[in-house]
């Protein structure tokens, strides 16, 4: 016979929630790198009974109505994906107790953060190009307060190579930005044999612009970038990119 023990204690455990903020994107789905990070966060959070309840972009937060609604959402933590404006961080630290940042640009020590060193990435990229025989290397990507750009300049110095502003293009990290950046370098008659792109999405636009000018990659000019997004392996030729562990 079945013997029943003491009445089972049934607990209703309320799952905890997290919001992801795509700080440098107008659309969450437009940033494949941080979309991959968000997916990894969701998988790890689930193991601890947390759920990604909301996803917003910096543009959403700039809307006062959405920002007001967000401040009223009962989430237990905020994860900021990518570089942000100061007012964005101020908004979250004022409204939420648990805020963590992840990206390539370190922020103040007073904040919790998971950072992959952008300076080391830049040095590794340029060192690889130098090993291939390149001594004239351009840069396409954001420049203001961007550790990959400062790392690019530092790497040139360490490798004994000159820095020329005309060999760089300050553009938004997007395929459109990369396309514009490549055309800027060609218009400036940049003296380069290789281009370091700040991320893969930018490199996609760069490659498109170079192909329009009948430049062969890597025969005429080499391109290297950062992130190792899934799309990179389907480009022709396949994009040379530095892997960043997302797990």
PLM ranges: what are they?
Residues 19, 75-82, 138-141, 168, ...:
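Periplasmic-binding protein-like
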Residues 79, 100, 112-114, 138, ...:
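Hydrophobic/aromatic beta-strand patches that form the interior of the parallel beta-sheet core
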Residues 1-14:
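N-terminal helix-turn-helix DNA-binding module of bacterial transcription factors
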Residues 114-139, 150, 154, 175-184, ...:
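Hydrophobic alpha-helical segments within soluble ligand-binding/sensing domains
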Residues 53-61, 167-176:
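Short beta->alpha junction loops
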Residues 13-127, 131, 187, 191:
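Alpha-helical recognition/docking segments in bacterial nutrient-uptake
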Residues 183-247:
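Flexible loop/turn connectors
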Residues 32-47, 121-125, 144-162, 177, ...:
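Short, solvent-exposed amphipathic alpha-helices that sit
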